[in-house]
């Protein structure tokens, strides 16, 4: 399976929901009109035409905070590019020049032993009952949308 190929299926889709801030802190939930969605749990930045306009550490006040207002700007926008790099960082660009850059947390080799079974971000394809989890230890695991997160995940290799 090629993760970038899977993600690129969202190019041309509209973002129908994009939320962060408030009780969600800086976690982002972004839904596409094809039913797929992404959730992020790590540091992110939003740029407009290459200029930084918000980061995950900005004001997370519900509705009115910079995080909430900025992430809502993605709603009703068409995805023009989406990809991951070799470090499994995620990049989503929409038609009006907004770009979401999701940077995975970096860990020292010694820290890897202390990591739990947590993800930095995940990508769900409900039509295929598939969730791909980008884990803190730089692995990718697959689960089912219809299964509880506590069910065992399958380690997968990506092209």
What are these regions (language model features)?
Residues 1-159:
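Surface-exposed, interaction-prone regions used to assemble/regulate multi-protein complexes
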């Amino acid at each position: 399976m090629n993760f970038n190929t899977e993600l690129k299926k969202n190019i041309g889709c509209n973002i129908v929901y994009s939320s962060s801030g408030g009780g969600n802190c800086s976690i982002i939930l972004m839904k596409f009109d094809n039913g797929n969605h992404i959730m992020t749990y790590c540091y992110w930045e939003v740029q407009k035409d290459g200029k930084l306009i918000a980061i995950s550490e900005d004001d997370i006040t519900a509705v009115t905070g910079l995080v909430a207002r900025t992430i809502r700007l993605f709603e009703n926008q068409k995805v023009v590019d989406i990809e991951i790099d070799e470090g499994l960082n995620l990049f989503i660009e929409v038609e009006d020049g907004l770009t979401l850059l999701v940077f995975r947390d970096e860990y020292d080799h010694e820290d890897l032993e202390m990591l739990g079974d947590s993800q930095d971000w995940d990508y769900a394809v409900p039509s295929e009952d598939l969730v791909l989890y980008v884990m803190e230890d730089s692995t990718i695991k697959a689960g089912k949308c219809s299964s509880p997160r506590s069910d065992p995940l399958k380690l997968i290799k990506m092209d």
